[in-house]
Every structure is written in structure tokens, then in C-alpha cells.
């Protein structure tokens, strides 16, 4: 404990947790955040981000606009276009693709749950408190508080918005 405090205290403790994390999704999120802005660990973070991206097949660019409270449920086969904007408290699952061919990426609101196997295509706006069911293909804008599913995704109801978002990161506006 004394050695940790001598080498930077809390930062070293957090790094120790990130390096030895049994949950690779947490480790990936940690190094993604550190690789997004210049800091004393920037080059180590870039390397770790690259290494974990290759190992788990996750492609999330550190330059992407990403809100607080990102939760990666099962971190494999995730591809997100670097121009995508993701709001606060977004939960993403495995086999997710958010892509574009015409440089018009998606904008995802706050408190959004994206289920496994979802494809979000082109210039769509996803509102706040939206739940997207497994295997959905989103090709149109989604309103706030909607639960959607299907190919193409259709609004099923407006009951219980954001019900799968737990442990929200409190953001002071």
C-alpha cells in the first residue's frame, strides 16, 4: 500500500485494477477513455486499446464522441463508426454494428439500451431512454422513450423507458 501511494496513489490503484481486470469489457472501456485524450499514460493507453481491440474484435475509435457511463455487456464483435455520437449511460451488447457508407453516422441519445446483434445504419437519430431489442435493424429515427424491435425496427410501445439502464452515471447539466 505504501508503494502504491508513493507511485501516485489512486491512479496506480486504478491502473492495477484495469491491468488485472477479470472483466475485459471494463478494461476495454478504461483504456478507451485514457486513449481518447493526451495524458501521462496516453501512449500506453493507445497500445492497450489497440491490443484489446484486436483480441476481442471491438472497433470503437478513441476519437469518437462518447458520453459518460458507457457499459459494454459482452464485449465481442462490436463495430462503431468513428463519427458516431453516443450520449450518456448507453448500454451496448455483443455483435453490434453502427455504420455508415456516406459519412453520416448515427446520433444516439442518453440512457439507451442496444441489444445483441443490432445494426444501426446511416443517418439515424435515436432518442433518449430508448430500448432496442436483439437483432433489430434500425434504419429510421427513433423517438424518445420508445421500445423497438424487428427488421426494420418498429416501435412496440412507450412503456418503461430505459428500463435496462441501471447504475446510471449522474451527469450535472
Predicted regions and their residues:
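Left-handed beta-helix
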Residues: 56, 62, 67-68, 73-82, ...
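Terminal amphipathic alpha-helical/low-complexity segments used for targeting or macromolecular assembly
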Residues: 1-57, 161-173
Amino acid at each position: 500500500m505504501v508503494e502504491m501511494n508513493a507511485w501516485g496513489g489512486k491512479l496506480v490503484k486504478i491502473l492495477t485494477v484495469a491491468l488485472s481486470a477479470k472483466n475485459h469489457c471494463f478494461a476495454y472501456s478504461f483504456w478507451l477513455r485514457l486513449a481518447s485524450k493526451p495524458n501521462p499514460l496516453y501512449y500506453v493507453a493507445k497500445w492497450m486499446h489497440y491490443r484489446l481491440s484486436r483480441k476481442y474484435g471491438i472497433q470503437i475509435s478513441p476519437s469518437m464522441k462518447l458520453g459518460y457511463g458507457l457499459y459494454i455487456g459482452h464485449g465481442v464483435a462490436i463495430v462503431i463508426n468513428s463519427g458516431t455520437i453516443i450520449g450518456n449511460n448507453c448500454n451496448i451488447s455483443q455483435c453490434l454494428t453502427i455504420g455508415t457508407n456516406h459519412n453520416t453516422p448515427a446520433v444516439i441519445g442518453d440512457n439507451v439500451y442496444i441489444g445483441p446483434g443490432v445494426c444501426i445504419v446511416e443517418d439515424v437519430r435515436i432518442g433518449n431512454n430508448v430500448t432496442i431489442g436483439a437483432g433489430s435493424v434500425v434504419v429510421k429515427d427513433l423517438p424518445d422513450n420508445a421500445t423497438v424491435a424487428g427488421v426494420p425496427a418498429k416501435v412496440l410501445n412507450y412503456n418503461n423507458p430505459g428500463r435496462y439502464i441501471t447504475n446510471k452515471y449522474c451527469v450535472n447539466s
